[in-house]
Amino acid sequence: MLKWKVLAIAGMAFGLAGLGWGYAQQQTFPGFYELRIYKAQPGKRDALAARFASRTAAIYARYGITNVGYFIPQQSDPELGIDASDTFIYIRAYPSKDERDKRLKLAQSDPEFREVVISQERDPNARLIIKAHNIDMTPSGSYTAIAVVP
């Protein structure tokens, strides 16, 4: 009888350990997202995308800003003000809005960011961006699927 009790307790312990491990392996997603839509100077969209790929995304990552994705629209939508030839879109993620504010402030004070982005955007002959739109977002309570497609 004692043998069965020991086995039952051991089984429950392993079951609980497995359950805990399963919860620990669940992928969690940040609680705050930011959709950024840039209208680039004519003919400068690809240069803007290259600046993000080569420098800006790495600066953000250094400060704990999650680069969710960078996108080039494949068609224009005049109703939304999107011209596929000059629009660049990206999504960043953070644990919260307060963390977004803190992390962006740190990133924007980084000497490399100031050199790469701020100085270029202040120079009328070198700037890449005409206008930037920002949409703050949180996951819907019922369903949010964020997946990376190979």
Label the predicted regions.
Residues 1-9:
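Bacterial N-terminal signal peptides that target proteins for export
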Residues 38, 70-73, 93-94, 135-140:
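Active-site-proximal beta-strand/loop segments in catalytic clefts of secreted hydrolases
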Residues 9-17:
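Bacterial N-terminal signal peptides
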Residues 67-75, 80:
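Intrinsic, low-complexity N-terminal interaction/targeting segments
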Residues 28-51, 55, 59, 91, ...:
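Surface-exposed interaction/gating patches
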Residues 25-28, 51-68, 83-85, 93-135:
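An amphipathic, aromatic/His-enriched active-site/gating alpha helix that lines ligand/cofactor pockets
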Residues 77-89:
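The conserved glycine-aromatic submotif of the RRM
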Residues 19-24:
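Sec/Tat signal peptide C-region and signal peptidase I cleavage site
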